Amino acid sequence: MAKYKLEYIWLDGYTPVPNLRAKTQIKEFDSMPTLDQLPMWGFDGSSTMQAEGRSSDCMLKPVACYPDTTRLNGVLVMCEVMMPDGTTPHPTNSRATILDDPDAWFGFEQEYFLYQDGKPLGFPSDGYPAPQGTY
């Protein structure tokens, strides 16, 4: 059996923009762990704006895992935040209810740059545009 570094990653409760949080645990597996082998894990939600100090337990539910190529036997574990019962999504967990909204739409945007003579189209031929230019 090999020891694996499981890096649990989740979004905290800060607004308007949540931050990424992480904590690591070491567990032994015969091979790279699969999602169903990863346990739920508790954390103190009072330090992440996801609970009050008097009742601060929250749970991390693994929803995806990927090899961490920067560490030997590392695994990145993407998590949802759940209430202490482990089944109810935390109010800051907007991902858990996304499929309940029939009007949810997602789009992808691909950006392109057009070049002429090795510079972006419209750039001056002898340098760069002014710092606050129209580009």
Spell out what each predicted region is:
Residues 1-135:
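Glycine-rich, acidic/polar active-site loops that bind/position phosphate-bearing ligands
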